[in-house]
């Protein structure tokens, strides 16, 4: 079951498909900033970590507001891979923005901003998730390269 998540907290993405003989990376995702301009909506929008590895921002769906985010991966080694970010309003003729940026040495790797226009409410009780799929790490490495002491990597067995 999905858990409520607040900006500044950490979530661990789920596995990504990898080539044979490789393991998915599980760096901790840290969304450092989520802001909007609507004074009637809380400044820290709710977001949740999903099993697909995306962070989803929950929004009030009747407001026009500006959003901004940035993400860092906090693994202890410089891991090869890339951040992928996607903004999808999914309503009112939904608008999607996507970008992929390279990541090196575990530094800040993704950021974006834009505007969301008012749209009809979604059929769930909290009337949220007008924007979702913010940041997801995409990268693979051979299991032999992973040290078991890395707190940011989950254990996983492969045939």
Curated annotation (Swiss-Prot):
Q: Where is this region: Disordered?
A: 1-23, 91-110
Query: What does the miscellaneous comment read?
Result: This protein has no orthologs in other species and appears to be the product of a protein-coding gene which has arisen since divergence from chimp.
Q: What is this protein called?
A: Putative uncharacterized protein ADORA2A-AS1
Q: What's the source species for this entry?
A: Homo sapiens (Human)
